[in-house]
Structure formats: C-alpha cells, structure tokens
Regions:
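Membrane-lumen/periplasm interface segments of specific transmembrane helices
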Residues: 19-29, 191-272
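Aromatic- and kink-enriched transmembrane "portal" helix at the membrane-lumen/periplasm boundary
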Residues: 52, 102-130
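Transmembrane-helix motifs of polytopic, lipid-linked glycan transferases
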Residues: 75-98, 134-138, 272-274
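Membrane-water interface signatures at transmembrane helix termini and the short loops
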Residues: 113-124, 269-328
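Specific aromatic-rich, kink-prone transmembrane helix
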Residues: 127-144, 148-156, 173
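Signature aromatic-anchored transmembrane alpha helix within multi-pass, membrane-resident enzymes
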Residues: 147-150, 193-198, 333-362
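Membrane-interface alpha helices of multi-pass inner-membrane proteins
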Residues: 148-175, 300
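Perimembrane helix-loop-helix junctions
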Residues: 170-197
C-alpha cells in the first residue's frame, strides 16, 4: 500500500515537473540570448570540438526537415526531459518505501532543482543522468555478457561527445559495475573494463587536444546564424576558467555551499550509514560510505574550474542517490531502519511538516555567489499563473 501510494504521488510530482519544464523551455526558446540554447547550438561545422555532437545532429536534421534549429532544439529538450522523468519513475517504482527514502528522493538537490533554477533546465548533464540510468538498468540484468559492456562503452562515448564533464563522474559508473561483479577483480573483468573505456579515452584525448581557431568558431556560428554564450567559450583554457572562479571567490560562498551540501545530503547520508554491503567479508560492511565519498571526490575539481556550484551539487547528489538505489534494488546492500527514540519524530504530522519544509522550502541557486532560494515549486507555479492570466 505504501509503495502504491508513493507511486501515485511521485507520478503526480513528475507530471507537474514535466509541465513546468515545458512551460519554461518555451520561454527559453523565445529568449534570443539564452545560455542553454547556445550550448545546444555547438556543432562540428567549424571542425571537431567538445560538446558538438548533439548540435551536429540537430544541424543535420534541420537540413532535412522544414523546422528551424531552435525548434528542433526545443523538441530535443522536451523529449530529453520527458524521457528522463520516465526513466526516473520506472527506476523507483518497485522500491519498498519508508519515510527516510522519501526524504532523500524529494531532496531539493534532486529533481526539483532544474525547474527551480530554469537556467539549468535541459542543460547537457541531463544526458549524463539518462546515460547513468540506462547503464544501471543494463547492469541490473542477472547476467552481463560482452554485448552489455559494448552498450556501456557506447553510451559513455556518446555521452562524452555531448558533455565532457562526465569525466569527473566516471567513478559512479565504475562503482555500479564493480559492485555488480562483487568487487571481484579477475583478469576477465579488468580486460572488459579496459576495452570498454578505450573509445571513451580516445574521444577525451581529442577533446583535450583539438581546439577551434577563431575562424573555425566563426564558421560554426555562421552555420546556425547565432554566436553567443557557450559558443564563445569554446576556446577558453583551464587557466582562464579557474581565474573566473578565484577572482570572485569568497569564504562565505564556500561556507554556504558546505551547509547546502550537508543539509541536502542529510537523508542520503543517514540511509548509507544504516546500510551495509551484502558480502561474506565483514570488513567491507564499513566501506560503503567510504566508497560513495571516493566516487564523489573527483567531481570536487569542478568547483575550482566553474562557478555553477549549484549544478555540481545537483549532479553529485543525483548520481549518489541513483547509485544507492541501484545497489538496493539489486540486493547488493541491505538497509536497516534506524530506531527513532524521539517521540516527536515518530509523529506523522511532525514528519509531514518536516517533509514540506525540507523538500519544498528551499533550493540551491546556480552560481557560487548566489544566495539560497526559497519555496521553489510555489514560486514557479505562481509565476506561471501570473504570466498566463
């Protein structure tokens, strides 16, 4: 009954997010200098470049059908959001729910964030999330053959062609394969992993070493008759990106985002602490939290090279949450319900109030210098009604 009730409300929640996503994507479509659109306009017409794969597909489609490039981008963005929400619902629908799981799933660091901060909506990390769920589904099958590792390799390669930021989140992908293999590092497994990552590493090499010239960027821009935002940042080197962060950094920003991290991750951290690996080796039972921290560490580099700290927290939380529930669904870990001694926390009404405050009372902003937002769902619905009437 709890699972059925959860699925009903969770589906309603996802439908609401989908409708809000469509509304705000339509607004972004009409904005001639919208950063997200500029990211999708990047293509290979000036030569190979990072983030150009999906833009090249869109460019080629625009030459075949009578829709404009912006219209095709809009359709791709809406389709990506819908497909992501569909995958999310199916990912969680068979899990036996409890209150702490619900708190973790409805954390403001997760699904509501891209809608709360519309400049993040349909950014290219959505392909990272879709790729991760697809790979998690593949490695949820009872037996994994060479063809499944081929799918793994192909999905990762396509994903890095779309968004190179995936490199900092590779540990999450390796995590689910390692735990699927019960941390058995035999020769066959190692060979499969190495072969699977070769195409990914080759693409990464070209992304790092191939740079468009100023004329190449002009050629690319001319192909779509637009040139702004992410398109003009393609030639930025790592040093200049770091300089943008360090020039605006203040210790208060770090403190704020550390608090956002701790509060937003609270439910998930509790869940991990009350879970253990199902293994004959008792020493491994204490390593679960350590493994999650290990997977998280490489992504910390993102906070040094780009100001979008809210996005990085959203990505880390999303992948951490999906990784945990992948392990739970496949019986790689077991969760032991914590015994709540505080009578107030066992009161249903108190839990509902805490749930509303924690899950719908706040959200992180996008840039490191931005303050914390409040009442994200209410504000977005109010904005829609206000602009419609």
């Amino acid at each position: 009954m709890i699972r059925k009730t959860f699925n009903y409300y969770f589906k309603t929640y996802l439908i609401l997010l989908s409708l809000l996503a469509v509304y705000y994507l339509l607004q972004k479509y009409n904005n001639l200098v919208e950063w997200t659109i500029s990211e999708w306009l990047i293509n290979y017409q000036g030569g190979f470049t990072r983030r150009g794969f999906i833009g090249e597909i869109i460019y080629q489609i625009s030459n075949i059908i009578s829709l404009s490039i912006r219209e095709i981008i809009l359709l791709f963005q809406i389709s990506a959001c819908f497909f992501y929400y569909y995958l999310i619902f199916n990912f969680f629908k068979k899990i036996k729910m409890n209150f702490i799981f619900i708190f973790a799933i409805f954390s403001p660091l997760f699904l509501v964030y891209p809608v709360a901060e519309v400049e993040v909506l349909a950014r290219k990390e959505i392909f990272l999330f879709i790729s991760f769920i697809l790979i998690a589904n593949i490695f949820s099958l009872k037996k994994n053959t060479n063809i499944h590792y081929f799918y793994f390799s192909s999905i990762l390669t396509f994903c890095i062609l779309i968004w190179e930021g995936i490199i900092f989140y590779i540990p999450y992908f390796i995590f689910i394969i390692l735990i699927k293999n019960k941390f058995n590092y035999n020769k066959k497994f190692i060979i499969r992993i190495i072969l699977s990552l070769i195409p990914f590493c080759l693409v990464l090499y070209f992304i790092i070493n191939i740079r468009l010239t100023s004329q190449d960027i002009v050629t690319m821009c001319n192909s779509v008759n637009e040139c702004y935002g992410a398109m003009t940042y393609l030639n930025n080197d790592l040093h200049s990106n770091i300089g943008e962060v360090t020039s605006q950094f203040k210790i208060i920003y770090l403190i704020r985002y550390m608090l956002i991290f701790v509060v937003g991750f609270t439910a998930l951290i509790i869940i991990i602490n009350y879970s253990h690996l199902i293994t004959k080796n008792k020493n491994q039972n204490k390593k679960l939290l350590f493994l999650f921290v290990l997977a998280l560490i490489p992504s910390l580099f993102f906070y040094v090279i780009a100001q979008d700290w809210g996005r990085w927290i959203n990505i880390s939380y999303t992948l951490s949450l999906l990784t945990y529930f992948y392990c739970l669904k496949n019986n790689f870990i077991i969760f032991q319900n914590p015994k709540i001694k505080n009578k107030s926390l066992r009161n249903k009404n108190v839990l509902i109030i805490l749930f509303i405050i924690f899950c719908f009372g706040w959200n992180q902003k996008t840039l490191m210098k931005d303050d914390v937002g409040s009442l994200p769902i209410y504000r977005k619905i109010y904005s829609v009604i206000k602009n419609t009437i």
